[in-house]
Structures are given as structure tokens and as C-alpha cells.
């Protein structure tokens, strides 16, 4: 299936935190970067990072532990840490719910991202739930993990990441009557700099439909999180 952007999930301007790269945006809705174009981005980023190290007084060229660091860092950003900036979300197939109209929830989904302010890592867990209508759509369970992985690998403002995951699930699971997303994550920009507080975590949630308007649905969502051992309420 051809890769494409899912309309309604891009919250910010291309190049901004939580957004796609300007290079990918130039390709249009159905575009992807070629291997050659990605390599050019890596080469340019490696050269820029080498200058960054030199500005900090790092003699990377003569240090055997650092001589390949600019290229390693550039590859890590493009192929891993920010991979979601350089590829659109793959087409995700939704299937008829076949009359099922109960809660569908996956908790304890790992998320790894990077703080957009100081480029320190973020790590945590995501819980996602939705309720399909009887004639609505459901997706394979691993697709929820894929959505988390895609948007997490962009560099994140956690609040926007929460909304992006919610919007993607909402768009893909057509005819749903509610979507809920919660992220519980620790930020190394808090533990490694500034206040240097270890163990502090941040919770963000985006609820819509029945999860926002009905106490019973909301309580079931948070109870399932508790049962999964993500956090205690």
C-alpha cells in the first residue's frame, strides 16, 4: 500500500517540533524521500554536526572515539531518533467492527522520543482506547503501536504528541464514538539539566466522545491502565 499522510494528523508546520521535515513536505501528500535524498540529508547533517563539535572545542577528527561521531549522529537522527520526520505514516487498513461496540484498548505501549527544547530523550508508556460503533471500523492491534512509534520518532512536545496520536486513531477508526490517549513519560531534560530532578514524570491525556462526556467510559479507560500496571490512580 502506498505511503501517504493521514489528513488531520499533522498539527504543526513542517519543520516544527512534532512535524515532518521540510524535505518531506516538499514531496506532497503522496510523496516519499528516495534513498539518495535521505543520504544527502545525512551527509549535510554530519557536516553541520562536525562544525558544532568544533565550535565546542572538540577535536573529533583526532580522537579515535569521536572520529565517526558526526556521521553516527546524523544517521541516528534520520534513521531512528527522528525517523518519523522523514517518512509519512504508512497506510493502515481498518476493518469492519462486525457489530462490536465495546472498548478496544491497548496499554503499556513503549514510546521513545526526544525533547524538542534540549534534544534530550523522553521515555514512557502510552495507553490508547477507542469505542467503535456497530457499523464502524477497527484496526489490528499492532497498528496502534505503529502510530505511537511514528509520531514519537519526530522529537516531541508531549502535549502535541498526545493529540497527534489521538487524531490518527480518530481518523483511521472511522465511525468511532470516542478515543482516549494517555502518555506517562520521563524527560531527561528535567533529570540531566536545570533542576536535575530524577524520577519526575509527566502525564498528558486527550479524550473525546464518550471518554470525555461519559464518566463510566472514562473510568473504564483509567481502570484498564491501572490493571495494566502503567500507573496507579
Regions found by a protein language model. Give the residues of each.
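A domain-level signal for the structural core that forms small-molecule/cofactor-binding pockets
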Residues: 2-233
Amino acid at each position: 500500500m502506498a505511503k501517504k499522510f493521514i489528513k488531520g494528523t499533522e498539527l504543526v508546520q513542517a519543520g516544527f517540533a512534532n512535524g515532518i521535515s521540510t524535505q518531506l513536505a516538499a514531496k506532497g501528500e503522496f510523496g516519499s524521500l528516495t534513498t539518495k535524498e535521505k543520504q544527502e540529508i545525512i551527509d549535510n547533517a554530519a557536516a553541520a554536526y562536525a562544525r558544532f563539535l568544533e565550535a565546542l572545542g572538540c577535536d573529533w577528527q583526532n580522537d579515535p572515539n569521536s572520529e565517526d561521531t558526526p556521521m553516527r549522529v546524523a544517521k541516528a537522527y534520520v534513521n531512528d531518533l527522528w525517523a518519523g520526520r522523514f517518512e509519512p505514516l504508512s497506510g493502515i487498513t481498518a476493518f469492519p467492527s462486525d457489530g462490536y461496540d465495546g472498548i478496544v484498548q491497548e496499554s503499556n505501549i513503549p514510546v521513545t522520543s526526544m525533547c524538542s527544547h534540549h534534544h534530550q530523550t523522553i521515555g514512557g508508556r502510552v495507553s490508547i482506547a477507542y469505542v467503535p460503533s456497530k457499523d464502524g471500523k477497527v484496526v489490528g492491534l499492532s497498528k496502534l503501536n505503529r502510530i505511537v512509534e511514528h509520531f514519537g520518532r519526530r522529537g516531541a512536545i508531549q502535549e502535541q504528541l498526545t493529540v497527534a496520536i489521538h487524531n490518527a486513531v480518530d481518523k483511521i477508526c472511522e465511525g468511532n464514538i470516542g478515543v482516549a490517549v494517555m502518555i506517562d513519560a520521563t524527560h531527561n531534560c528535567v533529570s540531566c539539566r536545570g533542576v536535575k530532578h530524577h524520577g519526575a514524570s509527566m502525564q498528558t491525556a486527550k479524550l473525546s466522545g464518550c471518554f470525555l462526556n461519559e464518566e463510566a467510559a472514562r473510568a473504564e479507560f483509567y481502570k484498564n491502565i491501572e490493571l495494566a500496571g502503567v500507573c496507579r490512580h
